[in-house]
Amino acid sequence: MIIDNLTIGKYISRPNRFTIEFKDKDKAITLAHLHDPGRLKELLIPNTDVLLKYINTYKETGRKTKYDVIAIKNKNNWILLNSSYHNKLVEELINTKEINSLENFHIDKPEIKYKNSRIDFLLKDDKNNPLYLEVKGCTLVEDTTAKFPDAPTKRGKKHVEELMEIHEKGIFTMVLILVLHNDADEFKPNYDTDIDFSQTLHEAYISGVKIYPLKINTELKNNSIILKKDRILSIKFKERNK
């Protein structure tokens, strides 16, 4: 996936969960919409380079901000911070058969309703067998270990529990975690931040729900971000009851 026509600014502050202040090339302070509601404390550091996309239709749509935050620099990496691209990226990877375990599947419906929730994708294989797929985005990496979530997520826990329910009916289910950091070599649930989600993810894994942390490499080239599939990372769960 390519996200083009980007501009670089300097991150200043985060007035609220969905807005940042940045300094543009003319040193003017401007607001931008931040689509990722996570804590991001290890990334949102003053004077850090941030990539932004100008939204031509911001007046017509009644937006208060002219820009969307796309990515932020961390060491020598660009980290995708715009979660609205997660499902678009997964859709592209499925359609181009780049995820080996899903190469026999196609997208039947996005945003499929289940009880009072919506699961990101309903896939079907060549024999019409369904697979319910939930997508999560992971930006937190400590040393070379990717960790999710970076903030407590009751909604995420609920999604995983629902996938376990579906799996118990004999239907394929999967959590696809997009690891959006070039330095990641393995994945571990973030027990310190959300023990309930982490234990639920482990239970789902044991029950047969497929948990795939898919590393995505990011490159900045000609004012564009290029996102490419790398590989499925190994998962490091804690021993149960510890």
Swiss-Prot record:
Underlying gene: sfsA
InterPro entries given in the database record: SfsA, SfsA_C, SfsA_N
The organism of origin for this protein: Methanosphaera stadtmanae (strain ATCC 43021 / DSM 3091 / JCM 11832 / MCB-3)
Pfam families: SfsA, SfsA_N
Gene Ontology MF term list: DNA binding
Entry-linked Gene3D superfamilies: 2.40.50.580, 3.40.1350.60
Name of the protein in its database record: Sugar fermentation stimulation protein homolog
Disulfide bond sites: none
Family: Belongs to the SfsA family.
Residue intervals passing through the bilayer: none
HAMAP family per UniProt: SfsA
